[in-house]
Amino acid sequence: MMTALETRLSVADGTHAAALRQRLQAALAECRRELARGACPEHFQFLQQQARALEGGLGILSQLTED
């Protein structure tokens, strides 16, 4: 049984997966820019966790779309 996300990602034209990938990549790029600027230790740790979560999301998306 496929999840709702897997169903949406299985659409033949792949527009949903491409749009989702683009949004995740943009969010990750912004997070990395903030990390490069520096922050207080608590905010820096939060940004690192956010970057790891976004990278994980991109990895899952790649597995689901078999890129």
Swiss-Prot record:
Quaternary structure note: Forms a stable ternary complex with PscF/SctF and PscG within the cytoplasm. Co-stabilized by PscG.
Result after altering L24S: About 50% loss of ability to lyse macrophages
Protein name per its UniProtKB record: Type 3 secretion system chaperone PscE
Inactivation phenotype: Deletion mutant looses the capacity to lyse macrophages, indicating the absence of a functional T3SS.
Consequence the record notes for mutating C40G: In strain: 388
Family stated for the protein in its record: Belongs to the YscE family.
Chief location of this protein within or outside the cell: cytoplasm
Compartments it resides in: Cytoplasm
Organism: Pseudomonas aeruginosa (strain ATCC 15692 / DSM 22644 / CIP 104116 / JCM 14847 / LMG 12228 / 1C / PRS 101 / PAO1)
A biological-process GO annotation: protein secretion by the type III secretion system
Record Gene3D superfamilies: Immunoglobulin FC, subunit C
GO cellular component: cytoplasm
Coiled coil regions, renumbered to chain: 16-37
Functional note: Chaperone of the type III secretion system (T3SS), also called injectisome, which is used to inject bacterial effector proteins into eukaryotic host cells, facilitating the establishment and dissemination of infection. Along with PscG, prevents premature polymerization of the PscF/SctF needle protein within the cytoplasm. Required for type III secretion needle assembly. Also required for cytotoxicity by influencing PscF/SctF levels.
Domain of life: Bacteria
Keyword presence, Transferase: no
